[in-house]
Amino acid sequence: MGDYIVVLEAPIIVKDVESVEEAIEAAVNKVMTALEKEKLDFVRVELGYSKCPVCGAHFESAFVVGNIGLVGIYLTLKVFNAQSLEHAERIAKAVVGKALKKVPLKLFEIRELHDGREENNGIEAGENETNA
């Protein structure tokens, strides 16, 4: 059994926005509201970044076309007592998926925690787990 930090990537679509900044704000608010409804205040929400295939520079994953915005969001949470990396991923997707229904979640990064200095605010294996 191990403890993991799992980072999921989610594409969020927002409507009636005119700028990238407005799209980012609307997407973050949409995600935060959904997470708060499910009492998932331990999930950290961050703006995603994409890498330019030509120069390698990173830029914000937010695009606006025709007043529709697509924003990449990273969702980070700790998963405790998971049996494996894959188990931790399934738990994270199940927990976040309850709040973000119909939003595809992709694993961005997963790290095993080795030191006990991390704070205990996350989800424990078996707690709130559904079929993912």
Swiss-Prot record:
A Pfam family hit: DUF555
Signal peptide: none
Family statement drawn from the similarity comment of this UniProt entry: Belongs to the UPF0212 family.
Stated name of the protein: UPF0212 protein PYRAB08340
